[in-house]
């Protein structure tokens, strides 16, 4: 149950600051945003900068610098803290470093008395979401990761550009790891209400083009990192979307890091991985278990096994 429409952000780096900015300019629900960072001056500077723009907002939001004690009455704690992916690194390369950072963060948040919902955006996000669940001992529906929400947004952008159709009218998901082993649910994809299979049969797109689009989705982060050093605007918007879904009790379907324990064929168990789920004020209302093709199911299992191999190395 929501208490105060209060959000605490832990991590004032590029992703956290982009989320905070997105939340302030498109805010109709959150009353208070508290920013915490190990670099206190950075957090204080972000708070000042955001507050100095209050005159230009349709609805003001109380932005404050804080400490872990401020988590006690928060509805949501968003975590973007941790080491960033560097050029040439995969997200999975960050497991050991960020899992240690998370142990300290989660311990401090839980010690405050926080009993709301965690939203995790730090990479590798599926594993960090699992780590959060284990360290916090929170119910699985109250621990959410950004999952493949950004991958899905990238996919819909590329399809929108290819077909000249608004992204809102493209229904397709990226599932699996937020990373190199992800896959697209092509068999379930619809563009402007029309199944993708019809576009293929009509010769309006080819399987080869679809493969190239997926490669662009997978490589997008590497390209952005190479060009500007980090990705943060798009994922900041994605986090804002998840937070609004919770605060606004939207019951919206989002491709988040969902807890899978036997869905999708029964082979994937005890893992957080990108899959569509219904998000509401309680967190995850339901992880969807829709039918995917045998080929897609094999990719899903492979992606889960890859994540599992890294999780098994973490000492809880």
From Swiss-Prot:
Q: Which GO terms describe its molecular function?
A: L-lactate dehydrogenase activity
**Record localization:** Cytoplasm
Enzyme Commission number(s) of this protein: 1.1.1.27
Cited Pfam families:
Ldh_1_C, Ldh_1_N
Q: Which residues bind beta-D-fructose 1,6-bisphosphate?
A: 156, 171
Record flagged with keyword Lipoprotein? no
Q: Keywords, A to Z?
A: Allosteric enzyme, Cytoplasm, NAD, Oxidoreductase, Phosphoprotein
| This protein's record includes keyword Oxidoreductase | yes
GO CC annotation: what is one?
cytoplasm
Return the SUPFAM superfamilies for the record: LDH C-terminal domain-like, NAD(P)-binding Rossmann-fold domains
Family annotation (PROSITE patterns): L_LDH (PS00064)
Which reaction does this enzyme catalyse, per its entry? Answer: (S)-lactate + NAD(+) = pyruvate + NADH + H(+)
Q: So what does this one do?
A: Catalyzes the conversion of lactate to pyruvate.
* PANTHER family per UniProt: L-2-HYDROXYCARBOXYLATE DEHYDROGENASE (NAD(P)(+)), L-LACTATE DEHYDROGENASE
Quaternary context:
Homotetramer.
Query: What protein name is recorded for this chain?
Result: L-lactate dehydrogenase
Q: Which organism is it from?
A: Borreliella afzelii (strain PKo) (Borrelia afzelii)
């Amino acid at each position: 149950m929501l208490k105060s429409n209060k959000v605490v952000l832990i991590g004032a780096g590029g992703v956290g600051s982009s989320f905070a900015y997105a939340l302030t300019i498109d805010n109709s629900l959150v009353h208070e945003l508290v920013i915490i960072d190990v670099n206190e001056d950075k957090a204080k500077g972000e708070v000042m900068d955001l507050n100095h723009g209050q005159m230009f907002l349709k609805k003001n939001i109380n932005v404050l610098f804080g400490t872990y004690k401020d988590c006690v009455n928060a509805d949501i704690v968003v975590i973007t803290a941790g080491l960033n992916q560097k050029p040439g690194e995969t997200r999975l390369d960050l497991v050991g470093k960020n899992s240690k950072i998370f142990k300290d963060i989660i311990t401090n948040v839980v010690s405050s008395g926080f009993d709301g919902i965690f939203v995790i955006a730090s990479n590798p996000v599926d594993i960090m979401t699992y780590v959060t669940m284990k360290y916090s001992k929170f119910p699985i529906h109250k621990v959410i990761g950004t999952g493949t929400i950004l991958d899905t947004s990238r996919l819909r952008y590329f399809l929108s550009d290819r077909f000249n159709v608004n992204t809102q009218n493209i229904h397709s998901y990226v599932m699996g790891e937020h990373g190199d082993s992800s896959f697209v649910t092509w068999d379930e994809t619809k563009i402007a209400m029309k199944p993708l299979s019809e576009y293929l049969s009509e010769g309006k797109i080819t399987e080869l083009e679809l493969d190239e689009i997926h490669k662009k989705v997978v490589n997008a982060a590497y390209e952005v990192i190479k060009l500007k050093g980090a990705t943060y605007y798009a994922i900041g918007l994605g986090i804002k979307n998840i937070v609004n879904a919770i605060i606004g009790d939207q019951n919206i379907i989002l491709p988040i890091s969902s807890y899978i324990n036997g869905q999708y064929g029964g082979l994937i168990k005890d893992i957080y991985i990108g899959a569509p789920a219904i998000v509401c004020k309680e967190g995850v209302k339901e992880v969807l278990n829709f039918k995917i093709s045998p080929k897609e199911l094999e990719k899903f299992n492979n992606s889960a096994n890859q994540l599992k191999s890294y999780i098994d190395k973490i000492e809880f």
